[in-house]
Amino acid sequence: MTKAYENRMLLQALVLAAVLCTTHAEGTAKAPLKHSVATGFCSFSKAAKQAANKLAQTLDAVKATLNQNRKAHLQNLLVAVKRPTEQIAALILGQYANTQAASGLSDLGKWAPDETKTIGQALYTSGRLDGFIDVLDGHRSENSGQNKNCIANDGDGTTKAFDFDALCGPTEVAKAGNEPGDLKSSDRNGFWWHRRAAASGGNNHCVIFDDLNTAYSTKTAATDFLAGLIKVHQTTGLTAATAIAAQKSTNKILKDIDANWPKVQQAYTTAAGRSPTTEQEYKDLLKDESSRQKLRAAAQTVNNWKPADKPANMDDYLKQVFKIDANVNSAYVTAMKEISMDVPTKDGETQKKELFEMSEEDLEAALAVEIRRLSSENAKLTTEVKQLRRNQGKQATEDTCNKMKGETACNNKPFCTYNATETDENKKCKFNETKASKSGVSVAQAQTGGTQTTTDKCKDKKKDDCKSPDCKWEGETCKDSSFILNKQFALSVVSAAFAALLF
């Protein structure tokens, strides 16, 4: 081996060592940032913008679900009030809507402080990254052949196109899309090469990464960008930063994202369904056993069956309640279509609308009208029933006094008075309400003082004697007057309607 050959081999080794040192070591002032590092930063930034848009999309969907379920509940509440015969069906559908609404609130509740703050932190980090990259991208010569850049080709520092909007996402976040990647993976993959951030090749012209100690007379400490993701030595430019494996849990702009991102991904998932609000949607829900199965839990809640009382065939029960015929037409849906009301609009004006035309605000206004109407009817019917019962009690007490024979026997009763001028011997002894009141005897007490109840009084009467207002002949027997019974039934209907409003 000649001396010249040995010298040549030594020179090659020194050149190789110099190349390796240039490739693997930082330490050249003005060296540009690697294109791959800038691209990795941008991939995270774009995903963060998409994550924010996904949050907006998710919350909008949850809001729409809550509104639709609320509308469905109001629709069926109005049916329960307006059509008492359809009340159970209406309450089942109303309960179904309530269940879906509760699920929607649960979806909303997933966005607790950790989740929402993580999205906020991701957007903040995106802004920091965008600002840093945008400044570097702007620091380049307009003559690409000069290879004067702050973002350059990794291997040789030459000019390489950098499409900021395509890589980092548009400046207007809303236009970035809404299918975020995994930010937990992005912070590992996007920042993987940040530690060795400087491009090699000797095209060192980025004034941002200049010898700061010389440029500013005195700069004794390194400068951190992005809370330490990028580190610039005070004299030798871009230098090695702490590895992302450590920074992801310590770097202030990343650590909360890495820790909480799994919670965010879970919060993106929604479970709530939407209750029907249109005629066709109700028909679709009731059309077959598979779809009607969704109503079984609501039917159980409304009826509160004990295990022994639960219908053997739940679908048969539902078909009966919703009055579904052989052609899968539901009389309940038909009843909904037939409901129309004068809905308050503004300044004392009203507008007639059908149920399926009503908005949520219309339904609320219609229910307010019904509540006032029911309250008025309830008060009126309660008064009428009390008065009817009082009148019947007086009549029964009058009959009790009429049956008393002789002045002494009559006057001895604390609620009777003998009238000697009465020509009818059967009516000389009469009920005296004033005497009864002074004696502390109520009509009810007087009525039980030897007379029959209204029911007993009618029960034994012959057909010719069975007359209103107290009695009515039905079939072969004399029964209580249907008038008061009808009033009592009407009162029970109103009470049931009120109960439906509270369900």
From Swiss-Prot:
Per the UniProt entry, the propeptide covers: 481-503
List of glycosylated residues = N419, N432
The record's listing under SUPFAM superfamilies reads: Variant surface glycoprotein (N-terminal domain) (SSF58087)
Lipid (GPI-anchor amidated aspartate) attached at which positions? D480
Which residues pair up as cystines?
Answer: C42-C168, C150-C206
Keywords on record = Cell membrane, Disulfide bond, Glycoprotein, GPI-anchor, Lipoprotein, Membrane, Signal, Trypanosomiasis
Gene Ontology CC terms, in alphabetical order: plasma membrane; side of membrane
Which Pfam families does the UniProt record give? Trypan_glycop, Trypan_glycop_C
Listed under GO biological process in this entry are: symbiont-mediated evasion of host immune response
Membrane topology for this entry? Lipid-anchor; GPI-anchor
Which N-terminal stretch is annotated as signal sequence?
A: 1-29
Give its localization.
Cell membrane
Q: What does this protein do?
A: VSG forms a coat on the surface of the parasite. The trypanosome evades the immune response of the host by expressing a series of antigenically distinct VSGs from an estimated 1000 VSG genes.
This protein is called Variant surface glycoprotein ILTAT 1.3
Q: Please name the source species.
A: Trypanosoma brucei brucei
